[in-house]
Amino acid sequence: MVVMKLITMKIFSVLLLLCFFVTCSLSSEPRNPEVEALINIKNELHDPHGVFKNWDEFSVDPCSWTMISCSSDNLVIGLGAPSQSLSGTLSGSIGNLTNLRQVSLQNNNISGKIPPEICSLPKLQTLDLSNNRFSGEIPGSVNQLSNLQYLRLNNNSLSGPFPASLSQIPHLSFLDLSYNNLRGPVPKFPARTFNVAGNPLICKNSLPEICSGSISASPLSVSLRSSSGRRTNILAVALGVSLGFAVSVILSLGFIWYRKKQRRLTMLRISDKQEEGLLGLGNLRSFTFRELHVATDGFSSKSILGAGGFGNVYRGKFGDGTVVAVKRLKDVNGTSGNSQFRTELEMISLAVHRNLLRLIGYCASSSERLLVYPYMSNGSVASRLKAKPALDWNTRKKIAIGAARGLFYLHEQCDPKIIHRDVKAANILLDEYFEAVVGDFGLAKLLNHEDSHVTTAVRGTVGHIAPEYLSTGQSSEKTDVFGFGILLLELITGMRALEFGKSVSQKGAMLEWVRKLHKEMKVEELVDRELGTTYDRIEVGEMLQVALLCTQFLPAHRPKMSEVVQMLEGDGLAERWAASHDHSHFYHANMSYRTITSTDGNNQTKHLFGSSGFEDEDDNQALDSFAMELSGPR
């Protein structure tokens, strides 16, 4: 009897062990190699803000982790942790994330060499390691990144020869290697935009246009949404002894089937969201109207940041905390279809410069056109000139130079060139460092793809419109130069263009008033009273001279924006001023400067720049005085 009990207990023990073995083997999964690679990356980085806090090495699913983006097939396609104060080194294990399309680790303190393993990522399209402390050479095998489109390694300490293999990447459209210690020569690139400024060993023997630094870009903003996680805790099934081996196996199989079914349903929901919101055009993201409607609280009036001739701008906030500015374009019924709209957007997106507002994405439908931009925390120059505390003189000078560089890029370095058509303080935005960022460029064409026989109104802002544009409808780079001159006067005086002269009960044209004070050497009467005595009188006088040069009556007499940049930086102003001062036209503008004739044949005299006639006009109101065809470059 005792022997039988012992035999029974041994058999039962064996069955119990088999039960747990089968249960564990069926319900467990092999370690995900992507998890292993990501944990290695985490372990080599110092994370002061805890952004990798939920990266669990025992997890089987990294798609629930922050800073990770996954495809509908549950594969890691994006790694992005910009501006998180990360330090340490970048692990070579990143090369095991073979499905990566985007790596965005800019604005950190990561040091060491760029791991050569990163060049083994066959699907990588975007690599941004800018503004870190990487050193050593750029891996020579970088040409293996055959799908790479966007590469930023600027502002590091990289050295060694300029990697000629970069020219072998067929789809590369943007390259920024500025401010490193690379040495030449520089080969020809398929990239439409590239920058090598700030590399002394290259630039001292290179052409000026290669090292002008005019193509430095705003950081690419990559949206990496965290996917919903799958259930990672497997219920430890402790089966009662009395149920036996067969019941244990059945329960285990049932549990695994249910878990996999739930995972598939979750992945379907994630896939639906990605296909709605991530249909991008190059580096642009295509948003759904529903996403932007939710982000802006239904485009509520409380979310409005500003209003202009092209439409309202709303503050938007996505679920991941990203804050953006959403411009809802008006008058879209007459615009062209999505194809032409997206083509124009692609051209705007190629205009990449630190002093140009970067386009993040768009929404295009039969009834809506929306553009999504980064949110500028310091607002516009127009709003800051009225805010407290007042902008100091050095900041105003910095704004003037930054805005000039942005327009210089649009006019002379962008291909095709872009004419802004509405240069004013409200369209010059300020980032967190009070760097000037030119906004609203290229929008005139987005809203004017009508048939050739259809006319459109002159677009601009009262007080900023050049006389030739108002009278003929023909715009050029010199139209923008005129508007920039008015902007300089606003920076000096702290007033809007229509307020010039009102402060001293001046009833004449405002430019004549400014010229009169300058000629009488009464510059201090022009300076914003909020500055007190904390400004450099010589610098104010020089900026005033540049403003007067920019606002000359004849477009041919105005300088190009490249010349404006040089003069603001202290080069060539005296010579240009002396030459212009000799022309009789400078102080005696033609009366047609202030008189225009309407298209119906009736003479209507309007003091374009005086205090009378526009006292009740709003500075943001677009002027639609005449219907006439616009032509010329973009």
Curated annotation (Swiss-Prot):
It comes from the Eukaryota. The chain crosses the membrane at residues 237-257. GO terms for molecular function: ATP binding; coreceptor activity; protein serine kinase activity; protein serine/threonine kinase activity. The active site is at 422 (proton acceptor). Residues 258-634 are cytoplasmic. InterPro entries: Kinase-like_dom_sf (IPR011009), Leu-rich_rpt (IPR001611), LRR_dom_sf (IPR032675), LRR_N_plant-typ (IPR013210), LRR_R13L4/SHOC2-like (IPR055414), Prot_kinase_dom (IPR000719), Protein_kinase_ATP_BS (IPR017441), Ser-Thr/Tyr_kinase_cat_dom (IPR001245). Keywords: ATP-binding, Glycoprotein, Kinase, Leucine-rich repeat, Membrane, Nucleotide-binding, Phosphoprotein, Receptor, Repeat, Serine/threonine-protein kinase, Signal, Transferase, Transmembrane, Transmembrane helix. SUPFAM superfamilies: L domain-like, Protein kinase-like (PK-like). The modification Phosphothreonine is found at residues 296, 322, 395, 455-456, 461, 472, 551. Its EC number is 2.7.11.1. GO terms for cellular component: membrane. Residues 299-554 form the Protein kinase domain. GO terms for biological process: anther development; cellular response to peptide; homeostasis of number of meristem cells. LRR repeats lie at residues 99-121, 123-145, 147-167, 171-193. ATP binds at residues 305-313, 327. Residues 1-27 form the signal peptide. Glycans are attached at residues 96, 109, 155. Residues 28-236 are extracellular. It is found in: Membrane. It is a single-pass type I membrane protein. The modification Phosphoserine is found at residues 380, 383, 471, 476. It catalyses: L-seryl-[protein] + ATP = O-phospho-L-seryl-[protein] + ADP + H(+); L-threonyl-[protein] + ATP = O-phospho-L-threonyl-[protein] + ADP + H(+). Belongs to the protein kinase superfamily. Ser/Thr protein kinase family. This is Probable LRR receptor-like serine/threonine-protein kinase At2g23950. It comes from Arabidopsis thaliana.
